[in-house]
Swiss-Prot record:
Organism: Shigella flexneri
Keywords (A to Z) from UniProt: Cell inner membrane, Cell membrane, Hydrolase, Magnesium, Membrane, Metal-binding
Name of the protein described by the UniProt record: 3'(2'),5'-bisphosphate nucleotidase CysQ
Purpose: Converts adenosine-3',5'-bisphosphate (PAP) to AMP.
Domain of life from the UniProt record: Bacteria
Principal EC category: hydrolase
Binding site for Mg(2+) 1: E64, D83, L85
Family assignment from sequence similarity: Belongs to the inositol monophosphatase superfamily. CysQ family.
A GO MF label: 3'(2'),5'-bisphosphate nucleotidase activity
Length: 246
């Protein structure tokens, strides 16, 4: 199934790139929470929804762009969790740091994940406890790697005072910034060793990256030390977390 999901992510990426390269208008509007949504978000959502319904018609789908109500999903044990375009702000900035995220959740855990960066044409994927990176047609296993001083990857769009204080107390380290779920992937492939995030995050923003990082050997825990959980609940928010090799 993983190969089919990867192809689906590529197809969604192709739809996004038609907007990114100017073939189709971007049409930026604001959602109720003031976050931006574009024609690319909607196009990718449509591709993924149609594809998953064909691939696995018995597994329900929760997508950021059309999340079903609590009464519909409260008893779900196995479901797809999708962010058709993670990093819409990066997309609008045209810096290439956005991804297509597709995860399969089973009893609260992401057991399969795909993170595809269309501009970079890089695919990260995970299933059955293994993680891969595919670039330039070459697919290889990836795993976490220690480094001293550690490289801490942080959000390009969500820096805050709490993060600044945390980094001041961390000890010797280096930092880099990147958008979207690529932060999870940098830890997964050994380029970074730590990704701290403070404040709540929507579940579709983390599930696919969580799957990739965990399969590569990283720990994805909240600040109380508990693994991030995707068991259906009324809120779509997970607490702050850290992705770490330690």
């Amino acid at each position: 199934m993983l190969d089919q999901v990867c192809q689906l992510a590529r197809n969604a990426g192709d739809a996004i790139m038609q907007v990114y390269d100017g073939t189709k208008p971007m049409d930026v509007v604001s959602k109720a929470d003031n976050s931006p949504v574009t024609a690319a978000d909607i196009a990718a959502h449509t591709v993924i929804m149609d594809g998953l319904r064909t691939l696995a018609p018995d597994i329900p789908v929760l997508s950021e762009e059309d999340p079903p109500g609590w009464e519909v999903r409260q008893h779900w044990q196995r479901y797809w969790l999708v962010d058709p375009l993670d990093g819409t702000k990066e997309f609008i900035k045209r810096n290439g740091e956005f991804t297509v995220n597709i995860a399969l959740i089973d009893h609260g855990k992401p057991i399969l994940g795909v993170v595809y960066a269309p501009v970079m044409n890089v695919m990260y994927s995970a299933a059955e406890g293994k993680a891969w990176k595919e670039e330039c047609g070459v697919r290889k296993l990836i795993q976490v790697r220690d480094a001293r001083p550690p490289l801490v990857v942080i959000s390009r769009s969500h820096a805050d005072a709490e993060l600044k204080e945390y980094l001041q107390q961390l000890g010797e380290h280096q930092t880099t910034s990147i958008g979207s779920s690529l932060k999870f992937c940098l830890v997964a492939e050994g380029q970074a060793q730590l990704y701290p995030r403070f404040g709540p995050t929507n579940i579709w923003d983390t599930a696919a990256g969580h799957a990739v990082a965990a399969a590569a050997g990283a720990h994805v825990h909240d600040w109380q030390g508990k693994p991030l959980d995707y068991t259906p609940r009324e809120s779509f928010l997970n607490p702050g977390f850290r992705v770490s090799i330690y």
